[in-house]
Amino acid sequence: MGNTTTKFRKALINGDENLACQIYENNPQLKESLDPNTSYGEPYQHNTPLHYAARHGMNKILGTFLGRDGNPNKRNVHNETSMHLLCMGPQIMISEGALHPRLARPTEDDFRRADCLQMILKWKGAKLDQGEYERAAIDAVDNKKNTPLHYAAASGMKACVELLVKHGGDLFAENENKDTPCDCAEKQHHKDLALNLESQMVFSRDPEAEEIEAEYAALDKREPYEGLRPQDLRRLKDMLIVETADMLQAPLFTAEALLRAHDWDREKLLEAWMSNPENCCQRSGVQMPTPPPSGYNAWDTLPSPRTPRTTRSSVTSPDEISLSPGDLDTSLCDICMCSISVFEDPVDMPCGHDFCRGCWESFLNLKIQEGEAHNIFCPAYDCFQLVPVDIIESVVSKEMDKRYLQFDIKAFVENNPAIKWCPTPGCDRAVRLTKQGSNTSGSDTLSFPLLRAPAVDCGKGHLFCWECLGEAHEPCDCQTWKNWLQKITEMKPEELVGVSEAYEDAANCLWLLTNSKPCANCKSPIQKNEGCNHMQCAKCKYDFCWICLEEWKKHSSSTGGYYRCTRYEVIQHVEEQSKEMTVEAEKKHKRFQELDRFMHYYTRFKNHEHSYQLEQRLLKTAKEKMEQLSRALKETEGGCPDTTFIEDAVHVLLKTRRILKCSYPYGFFLEPKSTKKEIFELMQTDLEMVTEDLAQKVNRPYLRTPRHKIIKAACLVQQKRQEFLASVARGVAPADSPEAPRRSFAGGTWDWEYLGFASPEEYAEFQYRRRHRQRRRGDVHSLLSNPPDPDEPSESTLDIPEGGSSSRRPGTSVVSSASMSVLHSSSLRDYTPASRSENQDSLQALSSLDEDDPNILLAIQLSLQESGLALDEETRDFLSNEASLGAIGTSLPSRLDSVPRNTDSPRAALSSSELLELGDSLMRLGAENDPFSTDTLSSHPLSEARSDFCPSSSDPDSAGQDPNINDNLLGNIMAWFHDMNPQSIALIPPATTEISADSQLPCIKDGSEGVKDVELVLPEDSMFEDASVSEGRGTQIEENPLEENILAGEAASQAGDSGNEAANRGDGSDVSSQTPQTSSDWLEQVHLV
């Protein structure tokens, strides 16, 4: 039994169908035990009997195996099915007992394999869950991703290919080499089969095909120009003349003369005609037309169907010239002075001048030969009547008449600014540029704005610039294109081969000079990242100084120390050398940077130019490809398909490639790092992507893309091209606007709420004013030398609108004099000269703080809480009834204390913004009131008044205070304000006092400039507002002992030294006795935000 099985296997492997059939039929036991789906094992690459039968195209055995439950979907070690092996042909060679190659394959083998393939395609296997039967996998792929159609196409088996395609084989399947079945046939030189597959692929049916082709048919393919042939020019001229004549009710000759005088512009003619028709005709060399006769719809235009047209019109001339027979005998020619024969056809001129026919012919021939065909006037002296065209045609010969028509068309084109001749030598075509109408729809192609130098085509493929008549260079204008060509001439790019490498070398050299120093011995670059000035070269072991680059042995105590260098001359020389080298390296780097930038644009410019030259050949091959596809499809389906889409796609590709080529010179001259350039480059990249996609689909020996996909790609490229040109015509993007002044907000919403502002905009306005004020801090000289800007708005204009109501939200008050008085009295009491000297470091650190930092503002607020400011008993009781601030957006809990009715909720403490506004007001007052110098400050009476607010350290009242209070931040700030602006603190008026512009403060000397327009406004929600309102005044501020002291101080300043002593006696222990001793006392009085 084993010998029979072995013999049968060998017969299958060798392809001996007769021996295999004989063994199989003569051994019933083999027939019963043989399973066609059983693998022969690894030595035979796991092929089954069905694989070998399909490989050699054994019809009888293959049919038998399929009838005995053979499964053609079984796979071998290469993941190949029986259909793969059937379509392979004799090219595959398998060693050692596997498939042996056959040197020759007869033609009958193709038909036999086609029969085997048909049997496999008709095979039905087990019933599946969906009620269908298992079928042979026609698109099964092996390890190399080849389908049976790939192998059939590579083998050139046309019958098998047709069967596979008919049963739905995938024409677009790609193997691991990205080859389709058409590509496989092409590589094996089966050209007819490849062409057949190409036609099947291109004209394959798809659900999207009809929709895309409908869009392609509806696509507006018009361009903003029109190529005109000579007959088109003649028809355009005649149509324009006829329409104008019909509109003006004038003869054709008159209409032509009017149009010629107005540059063939109908709108221009109508404007002149409506203003003065007689003057318009006179300047054009024609007479004013009369109304047409009855039976005619216009002068010499279309005849009426009811009235026959006569050979000669009796109304040719406005002046009806009637000559008697006696006069005809005596008429003379005005040129030759000979009698005009009666037998000659008369030449009737509208002006009435008579000349013989011979003189007319000689005169007209001379004018036509001179090229003045469009302005031939009457030969009479001082007559400017134009000779009608019908007279010229009736007098001159046919050959001369032909030349006249040529000159006439030439004059029509040259006098029409909307038409230009094609500059290509030997081309007789012209181009008409379509004018863009303002009433065109936005979706119309012609509604796109025209470029300054559009590219036009005469219809023969001759592209040229409309403006300069040179090479087409849109989107560049003529001057930009000229500059680009000049740049190429100057740069000589053929000599700039290694620009990129040189640019990198220059950049490296600049970096080394900027970040390193050369060794003084071996000149190797050394970078210092840590350590002292004693350097040792790692290459030559040379010890040198990093500062002066000289030998380290020269350094000792004479140079400032062993690890310091104070050798000024040497250091100066080294720095000059380093600076010169750096400047030279920067120049070199900048030059190579410019060269590298030019090479970037020039390289891409040349790449697109080279691609354009290669793709121009597709115009010739596209026509051949169209004929081949039509012929191949006609043989298979019998129809003649539309193949013009290939040529259209090539034209779209060439137009876009040319625009991309010229877009790089346009981008080269754009402003670097501008919004306009960024938008341009984005659109340019987008256009390049769709263009390359279309090029891959079209620029192939065999098309492998369906027709509808090629059409879709071409439509997309055309759309992107039009959008790109329209964008460039509009200027790509508006000019970059200047950057507006930035007003930064705080990090989160809680910042401006926590700091007491009603909105982020109010906080931004505050920050802006803080940045633009005078920021010099220091002594009195620096304050007095920086007066405020007269154009800068005052605090009142910034905080209070014109209507008089505050812009702040409820619960946020402007600083009042009363509250500031309490604050000053409690803070400045703690300041003494001794304490100021002890806290000098704190004051220096404070002078460098940034007031705009929210963290600093928060620290000031917290310092208020810890400072324990003094308040009188009445004020403390009033503040204890403070309402909750949680309702205004703070993160603090609401107060549970009861709030007295009919009482406004005061603010417990100053917000950070109010504290900083206080500092601004103090500085502004100090700058405006500058009556003193630092020398006279101590001797002025104001210094005596200062002692009321700032008692000395020897004062017994101040000696008994807690020294820890002097360490708080707020006390230091107030002390600093006091030292810098001593006069400003004394000048703060009470809330109930308005300072007029004419009044002068007591601390100002005679002749000095007074403080003008100083008014402190108290809002309705002030913290010390009294319930009683007197008639004629606003809300009154609760009296305060410190206010009385200030008023007393003012009166004392006016009265003299005695008043100052009275003011000193007026201050006193009342304020100091109100000061809380601990922070807890202050927390009980004030609810701090």
UniProtKB/Swiss-Prot annotation:
Top-level enzyme category: transferase
Binding annotation for Zn(2+) 1: 333, 336, 356, 359
Residues noted as binding Zn(2+) 5 in the record, renumbered to the chain: 545, 548, 555, 565
Zinc-finger ranges (IBR-type): 401-478
InterPro entries in the cross-refs: Ankyrin_rpt, Ankyrin_rpt-contain_sf, Ariadne, E3_UB_ligase_RBR, IBR_dom, Rcat_RBR_ANKIB1, RING-HC_RBR_ANKIB1, TRIAD_supradom
Biased composition, class Polar residues, residue ranges: 931-941, 1070-1082
CDD domains reported in the protein's UniProt record: BRcat_RBR_ANKIB1, Rcat_RBR_ANKIB1, RING-HC_RBR_ANKIB1
ANK repeats: 45-74, 144-173
RING-type zinc finger span: 333-383, 519-548
GO biological process terms held by the UniProt record: protein ubiquitination; ubiquitin-dependent protein catabolic process
Modified residues (Phosphoserine): 737, 884, 911
Span list, region TRIAD supradomain: 329-569
PROSITE patterns: ANK_REP_REGION, ANK_REPEAT, TRIAD, UIM, ZF_RING_2
Spans annotated as Disordered: 281-321, 776-821, 889-912, 927-964, 1026-1089
Protein name as it appears in the record: Ankyrin repeat and IBR domain-containing protein 1
Gene for this chain: ANKIB1
